[in-house]
Amino acid sequence: MAKNDYVEIMEKNHMEIPWHDYTGNDSEVLIQQAGLIEKASVVGRVGLIMLSCGTGAWRVRTSMNRLSKELGVTCTVDVGLMSIEFNCFDGKECVSQSLSIANTGVNTSKLYRMEQFVDSFPSREAHLTGEEIHKRLDEIEQIHALYSPVKLGLAAALACCGFTFLLGGGPVEMIFAFIAAGVGNLIRMKLIKHHYTLFLNIAVSISAACLTYAVCLHMAELLFHISAVHEAGYICSMLFIIPGFPFITSGIDLAKLDLRSGLERLTYSIIIVLVATMFAWIMALLLKLQPQDFAALHLGNMTHLFLRLIASFCGVFGFSIMFNSSVYMAATAACIGAVANTLRLELVDFTRMPSAAAAFIGALTAGLLASIIKRNHGYPRISLTVPSIVIMVPGLYLYRAIYNFGIMSLTEAVSWFAAAIMIIVSLPLGLIFARILTDRTFRYCT
């Protein structure tokens, strides 16, 4: 093998698919009259773009099925986290393809545009040639990040600042978490932009967030005589790393018995959590930080309720922007999250309801509200529900579980871990039952 060929392979482990080679550039044959290979290329590419947006297997398969029916072919699909295997039949021939993406992520703006493409396909794209359809898909595929790394750093800062208050932190912890999370996610986005590997960007961004928080705390002690009791907020500064989308979509996939996709997404989420919490624990040992309880805020009930609404709105808005939502879509998700998360917290405080049960009700509420809004605005349901309940994911519990495992305080570790697992299971369950109640296509086993 020539040296240049070797370098080219090393530069891109996943080779790009020449989609336009499946069609004749000068062909005027409409896609409905085209051959099976050309039809399969359109169906497969639509599924692959949907998969790259972070949506679950059920939505990917549904989109591919809708296009297949319109093109007069039968399609069977097996979907994973990073790849799709599918077969297309037209009664005479069969085409089998295995497609994969180079990396996984979340892009709700691209997902929204793809859902519009699928919805309009019978009336618009079905009357075009394969080449024209691929050109339109080229345009959609170019929808990358809507925001610069600096803006995404600010979004993470806002989200973690709101998260800090909701977990019991005060103004000092909120300010430090804002700065540290902003720095951490800014570095993370820079690393992602340059295609650094997953483990490296998690380790560096988490370490940077912890270090920034510790520096801010130390400077505040020296300059303003701030008490070291505020060190507890360092946990909140790294909650931007929570893999909310794969966590929730894994539960939805498992509910539809898409076991391959569900287990792969769950594994991916666990990898992120383990790497993040391990490096956070190491940084805590090096910087002598401890996950203490927050100091009491002594707020009145109505004041606390009002501030929880604001903090929940800010937290969900920040996470939604991080998922590449438009500002209006992010604000819509934030309104849902403000209602659902505040309801969850109030149920825990005033009815002594177990946290897991309250999380189920909060997620159910978010799912019902998202279904109502989807009917009126057409936003992808998952683009509203996942950001609105990411703020309910018990990142603090998961970190404390790993921290206590690290110091061999096993009883404490198991207690925190059990509480986290109960809440994590309850969140997708709430969304699933909301979907069952409001979506007849999801309700039945087909």
Task: Name what the model sees in each region.
Residues 131-144, 158-169, 188-196, 286-300, ...:
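Short juxtamembrane and helix-loop transition motifs at transmembrane-helix boundaries
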Residues 146-249, 321-323, 327, 332:
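Core alpha-helical transmembrane segments of integral membrane proteins
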Residues 233-238, 249-253, 257-273, 335-341, ...:
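C-terminal transmembrane helix-loop-helix hairpin of multi-pass membrane proteins
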Residues 249-319:
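Membrane-embedded hairpin module used as a gating/binding unit in multi-pass transport
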